[in-house]
Structures are given as C-alpha cells and as structure tokens.
Amino acid sequence: MKRLVIMAAGTGGHIFPGLAIAETMKARGWQVSWLGTSHGMERELVPKAGVEMDIIEFSGLRGKGLQHTITGAFKLVASFATCFSILKRRNPGIVLGMGGYVTVPGGWMAKLRGVPVVLVNADAALLLSNKTLMPVAERVLFGFPADFGPAASKALVTGNPVRQEIISLPAPAERYAQHSGPLKVLVVGGSLGAKALNDAMPLALAMLPPEQRPVVTHQSGKKNIDALRANYAQAGVDAEVLDFINDMPRRYAEADLVICRAGAITVSELTAAGVASVLVPLLVSTTTHQRDNALWMEKQNAAIHLPQSELSAQGLAELLQGMTREKCKQMAEAAYANGRRDANAAIADVLEKLVKIT
C-alpha cells in the first residue's frame, strides 16, 4: 500500500491545493492522511473531504510578542515528538508539505524516519517553511518558473494543484455564451476576507445607477460578515454576502468578473478555469509576490491590476461602469490560455517516483 501524509495548515491557499492532491492520490489507490492544527481552516475542511487528520499544537514563532514566542518554542519542541509518533503510526512512504508552520516539525521528523519529503512552493519565491526544510527535501515543486536560488538542484516547475471541479469547467467561450442580463461579479478577499474590498465595494455599487449595477456575490470572511452586511445595507445596495464560499467551482462558472487578491493559488485557479479578474494584491511589507502575480496577469491581458493604494469607491465604480461581458470574455480566454491544468498529475507522478512502499 502506498501511503501519503499531506502537511498543510492555516488558510485556504494551503488547504485547497492539498485537498486537490489528496483527491488525485486517492484516485490512484493511495492511502492519504493529513497533518494539521486545531486552529486552521484544515480542521473543518479536511474531514469534510473524507481525509483522516492528525493534529499538532503549533502555530509558528514570529510576531505576537515575547510571550507568544516563548510559548511557541515549547510547543515546537513538543510538536517534534508528536510528529514522530504520528508518522510512526501512519507509516507513510512519502510526505508532502503544502505550506504552513506544521510542515517544519513534520518534515524534519519524516527525514529522521527515512521518509522522503516533497515540498510544494506556490509562489516563485521560497516560503520560509520551505527554506527551513531545504536540507531534508527530495524535491521542491514550484507553481511558477523563477530563480530558484538554494532550491535549484531540487526544483521542478509543475504548476500549482487546483481542484478537479475547477479544472473540469467548460472553456470560457462556452460559459460566457450562456451568460445574460447584468454582469455577475464575484468578490473574494481570500478565505479570511479583505477589509479594503469589504469597505470599497458597497460604496462603489451605490455610485452606479441601479439599472447599471452588476449582480454581486461577496465573500466577507467569517469575522467580517456582520460589518459587510451593514456596509451594503447602509449603502442601499443588494448583494449576496457569504462568510465563506463552499462551492467555488460553480461560482467561478457563473461569474463574468472576479475581484480578488492575487495569491498564487488564486491566480492558478483563475487561469485553470479561465475567469476575468480585477486583482488587488495584498500589501505585505516583506514580499512582492502578489504584486508580481497581478502584473504578470495584466501583461497577459488576463486581468486588471488594481493596487490597493489606488483602490477607491469612485475608481472601482468607474471600472465597473466601463466593463462589458465581451471584455470579460476576452480576459477570461487570455487567462485560460495561460492556465496549467496538468499540475495535479505532474505532482502525483513525482510522488509515485519517490515513494517508499510500506
């Protein structure tokens, strides 16, 4: 029996690609389990997908003050012992790190047990957790071509894993031909929401005459749903507001335009499905990954790059007013032309080559 432990924790950007690989490997007859935490999105999403999960109590060491750092250090030490015990019990032939701090103790303990370690790196630049695991990794699978630096000898560009339901959507020309009526806009701030989009979108729609307003579905993030609903009510605008979208493939299929962040997994999904987008990169002082992703998409005529520093209700209203379904379709087709729909199989093939039969 071929056994895989997937290590991933935190946000949807780590969890959904891992679930895509879990589905692929189970279809190939593998036994798959998950190593995660009790406080990340994996706690809810992984069991729903029918994947067994083991939990460690660790959430990283950076930020949040001295007490958090000290407590985190003790939890890190304990997590190594817990991971060793879990891996002994699960007896995997290979482990796959998708990102998040959970991969660090899991990866090192896998190496100690002689289990091959493969890492997925969604962005062109190395994740901090993957840098930490570089000495023990057999392969590092990148979502995008880049200067791989210290990972060069182990690097392989496979593209990012995307859920099969997204890959299997009809091509943009077929989908957009079936759309009619007002534009349908999907606003997604990532699995945790995005306050900048939550603030600007209701005001932007209020500036448009009712007959020119698109039909909007807006994912708020669980912590922001009440505030966002209040924003729409105060603006006098109707919108479908959801804390989390469980049926994203269907939402992509129905949308003419997606307004969202520019994370690597989001971009991979938009290009795999072929959906037009307005990309508002997350402002992070230490990286430019999302900005680079948005600029690349804009260069392919697949998206509009809207820096958060330039995001305003007035500007967003003008952008929406000038948007047509034909323009959206053209961007969607450009996105589709740049999509990789073979990443799941490419990653699965790497795992097949490196696995130890247990």
Swiss-Prot record:
Compartments reported by the entry: Cell inner membrane
Gene name linked to the record: murG
EC number: 2.4.1.227
Topology of this chain in the membrane: Peripheral membrane protein
Cell inner membrane keyword on record: yes
BP terms from Gene Ontology: carbohydrate metabolic process; cell division; cell wall organization; lipid glycosylation; peptidoglycan biosynthetic process; regulation of cell shape
Protein name in the entry: UDP-N-acetylglucosamine--N-acetylmuramyl-(pentapeptide) pyrophosphoryl-undecaprenol N-acetylglucosamine transferase
PANTHER family reported in the protein's UniProt record: GLYCOSYLTRANSFERASE (PTHR21015:SF22), UDP-N-ACETYLGLUCOSAMINE--N-ACETYLMURAMYL-(PENTAPEPTIDE) PYROPHOSPHORYL-UNDECAPRENOL N-ACETYLGLUCOSAMINE TRANSFERASE 1 (PTHR21015)
Keyword field: Cell cycle, Cell division, Cell inner membrane, Cell membrane, Cell shape, Cell wall biogenesis/degradation, Glycosyltransferase, Membrane, Peptidoglycan synthesis, Transferase
Protein origin, superkingdom: Bacteria
Organism whose genome encodes this protein: Janthinobacterium sp. (strain Marseille)
Reactions this protein catalyses: di-trans,octa-cis-undecaprenyl diphospho-N-acetyl-alpha-D-muramoyl-L-alanyl-D-glutamyl-meso-2,6-diaminopimeloyl-D-alanyl-D-alanine + UDP-N-acetyl-alpha-D-glucosamine = di-trans,octa-cis-undecaprenyl diphospho-[N-acetyl-alpha-D-glucosaminyl-(1->4)]-N-acetyl-alpha-D-muramoyl-L-alanyl-D-glutamyl-meso-2,6-diaminopimeloyl-D-alanyl-D-alanine + UDP + H(+)
Keyword Repressor: no
One of the record's GO molecular function terms: undecaprenyldiphospho-muramoylpentapeptide beta-N-acetylglucosaminyltransferase activity
